[in-house]
């Protein structure tokens, strides 16, 4: 296999998928729309129902593999469902980010991406989320990190902010 970095010479072909909740087939089929022209895959949260098993984490990689074959860059954004379950607190150990965080910046193909971790849509006291939840602290740390940022892709063709936003029903 061969990896091809994002190439913006003809614009960027980006596929952004969220909320497929462990249903890989439709998301993967849609993700192959660009074929070899795909530049960047964004997995924008809720790609699994929760993080109760390591097998579920593997589904995130399986989805990326079915779309990119390991040959294109993938950006991962945590969704609110990835805040629930036994392994939720360990998710940064298995997925890309920086410094053990799921909020980070990256530049690909002339595009600057800022990835925010909007974490959970429930309070830390809610029994449905992991007992190790401390999202108030995470939000404080992420706010400090955001306030310390000085580069926002000013020399890039595109500047893109990524976040998974849970909408209450």
Where are these regions (language model features)?
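Extended active-site neighborhood of metal-dependent phosphoesterases/phosphodiesterases
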Residues: 1, 58-155
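Acidic, histidine-bearing metal-coordination/catalytic regions of metal-dependent phosphoesterases
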Residues: 1-15, 21
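Active-site neighborhood of phospho(di)ester-bond hydrolases with catalytic His/Asp-centered motifs
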Residues: 15-19, 41-46, 72-80, 160-164
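Active-site environment of divalent metal-dependent phosphoester hydrolases
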Residues: 22-26, 49-52, 78-87, 121-124, ...
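A short acidic, amphipathic alpha-helical/loop segment
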Residues: 26-32, 56-63
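Active-site metal-binding motif and surrounding structural segment of the metallo-beta-lactamase
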Residues: 32-51
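Structural motif
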Residues: 40, 111-113, 158-160
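Short acidic, glycine-rich surface-loop motifs adjacent to enzyme active sites
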Residues: 150-169
